[in-house]
Amino acid sequence: LTPSWDTDDNIFITAQASNITIANPTGTPVNGQTIMIRIKFNAVYTITYGTNYRAFVAALPTAGVAGKTLFLGLIANTTDTKVDTTAMSEV
């Protein structure tokens, strides 16, 4: 999965059926710009991230849980050239 600052506001994956890599976003971000990612997992799968992701409050999840939905909020931080990741929760 490669989010794009130029075209994505929300990304919905309704039946993730394999391991997933969330690559660094492409495009030109505006400082503070957001993208919300929602992924529902069919089984337990690993999650890996590009090198620009930075978690706040808790570590980024490394596995999806069968039958659960993961929410990730991405915030462009052009000052630090990072993707600040917030709003992590699994329901």
Feature roles, as predicted:
Residues 1-7:
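Predominantly extracellular/luminal regions of secreted and cell-surface proteins
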Residues 14-91:
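Acidic, glycine/polar-enriched metal-coordinating patches/loops
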